[in-house]
Swiss-Prot record:
Keywords: Cytoplasm, Methylation, Protein biosynthesis. NCBIfam families: prfA (TIGR00019), PRK00591.1 (NF001859). Its main location: cytoplasm. It holds the Pfam family PCRF. The modification N5-methylglutamine is found at residue 235. Signal peptide: none annotated. Residues 284-312 are annotated as: Disordered. SUPFAM superfamilies: Release factor. It is found in: Cytoplasm. Disulfide bonds: none annotated. This is Peptide chain release factor 1.
Length: 360
């Protein structure tokens, strides 16, 4: 391993020890903001420090074991142990490289998840409902909380559009690769001839930014409309104009929120979603420039990018970005999507490592 990397790891180890001492000081314990910040930083360093300690132990073990090579009775055992330790060192170094990759500061945030029915009429709306259930069950398995902000139900079931906020630890980091076009191939319940139809939905995932990171929005750039909240079939479920629609005039971005009875609360939530969308649009613009020069698993920002196909007759799900196919469609639609999410994260980390190698 390079001396520069070892030096960085030593610095992180020292910081970890420093934080451990700070967390035991009464002045820090009594300051909740400081205690939370230090605890979070300490937890973030835990894995890399443990892995580095293991790497150090393995290297020391090889040095000590090499002393046994001169002993005829111990030579064979010593050679085997050295070989095993070298293999473990290689694994530890690969793990350390991944742990040292630059972290996306947004990964720890809550996320806004938007699902919109695309081509396919009623069937696309039904599939949007299926995707919402899939993500809700996945969130439940992670002990995250799902809060519906706006839902426009379709007549045959499902949704024309649904926007939710997912609250929990590391939500955006886990869900950010879900953005893009999701396609379904199946025989709709309304199809009498038994023909397979193809429908599509788009999914967008955005981090919920803290107030100090939100882009500045000029109030004069906003058009705010209020209307009565409506339920399935369009019937009004509220006698006051509590639902809010905000249009950001310069970008044309429109956000609606009607889940609260209070217009003030709906407006605050809609403004938060709007800020995240504006920030995301800027990130997507930068991602497009990146995608022009190299592969970008986060997508170019074009929500029509087809990222995944759910084929019901064959019981398979295919992720087109990494050519991954799994034949457990029922499990996937019941929220078991880690086997789709983790390979994408691993591939993204490999791309980052390749980029760092090129720079070095």
């Amino acid at each position: 391993m390079k001396a520069s990397i070892i030096s960085k790891l030593e610095s992180l180890k020292e910081r970890h020890e420093e934080l451990e001492a700070l967390l035991g000081e009464p002045s820090v314990i009594n300051d909740q903001d400081k205690f939370r910040a230090y605890s979070k930083e300490y937890a973030q360093l835990e894995d890399v420090v443990k892995c580095f300690a293991r790497w150090n132990w393995l290297n020391n073990n090889i040095e000590e074991t090499q002393l046994l090579l001169d002993d005829p009775d111990m030579k064979e055992m010593a050679e085997l142990e050295i070989e095993e330790s070298k293999a473990e060192i290689e694994n530890a170094e690969q793990q350390l490289q991944i742990l040292l990759l630059p972290k996306d500061p947004n990964d720890e945030y809550n996320a806004y998840l938007e699902i919109r029915a695309g081509t396919g009429g009623d069937e696309a709306g039904i599939f949007a409902g299926d995707l919402f259930r899939m993500y809700s069950r996945y969130a439940e398995s992670k002990r995250w909380r799902v809060e519906v902000l706006n839902a426009n139900e379709s007549e045959q079931g499902g949704y024309k559009e649904i926007i939710v906020k997912v609250n929990g630890e590391g939500v955006y980091g886990q869900l950010k690769f879900e953005s893009g076009g999701h396609r379904v191939q199946r025989v709709p319940k309304t199809e009498s001839q038994g023909r397979i139809h193809t429908s599509a939905c788009t999914v967008a995932v955005m981090p919920e930014l803290p107030e100090n990171e939100m882009p500045e929005i000029n109030p004069s750039d906003l058009r705010i409309d209020t209307y009565r909240s409506s339920g399935a079939g369009g019937q009004h479920v509220n006698t006051t104009d509590s639902a809010v629609r905000i249009t950001h005039i310069p970008t044309g971005i429109v956000v609606e929120c009607q889940d609260e009875r209070s217009q003030h609360k709906n407006k605050a939530k809609a403004l938060s979603v709007l800020a995240s969308r504006i920030a995301q649009a800027e990130q997507e613009r930068q991602a497009q420039a990146q995608a022009d020069t190299r592969r970008n698993l986060l997508g170019s920002g074009d929500r029509s990018d087809k990222i995944r196909t759910y084929n019901y007759p064959q019981g398979r799900v295919t992720d087109h970005r990494i050519n991954l196919t799994v034949y457990r469609l029922d499990e996937v639609m019941n929220g078991k999507i880690d086997e789709l999410i983790q390979p994408i994260i691993t591939e993204y980390q490999a791309d980052q490592l390749a980029m760092l190698s090129e720079q070095n």
